């Protein structure tokens, strides 16, 4: 996982080889830095990343994260992965829901039935099974629960509100009128 994180290209989103674009604003990098420094000061291991060049934050992996750390239950909104050990599936569910936020989550498993049962209990607006936590599809409603938002964007309602319908027809050849 760490080796893969080190290979992820960060940069200009107009470059097709870029995987991670810039943080939303340069000042947010200080916020992310504070989360990482807090975690390391409280015992987390920084396995990779933790640096940025302007608004381009390197993929960061922290291990041995605990509930005492900001990255545990606050939205960092950066390419930061927090790794912590859990005892079993019940403990994993408790940890996943132990936050006042709930935008998106992932369940990784080979057992899809278990994943679906787990997903139903997750307190998140979006749950992705065997995929990353962010997958944007304009036809699907995007939004969180708890303090991660109110309502949804995208989906049918979003498409209806943000588009204009236009009917265009093409008649190839002469139309045969009944008169």
What is the role of each PLM region?
Residues 6-13, 21-24, 36, 42, ...:
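Conserved C-terminal structural/oligomerization subdomain of aldehyde/semialdehyde dehydrogenase
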Residues 45-50:
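Diglycine-centered glycine-rich loop/turn motifs
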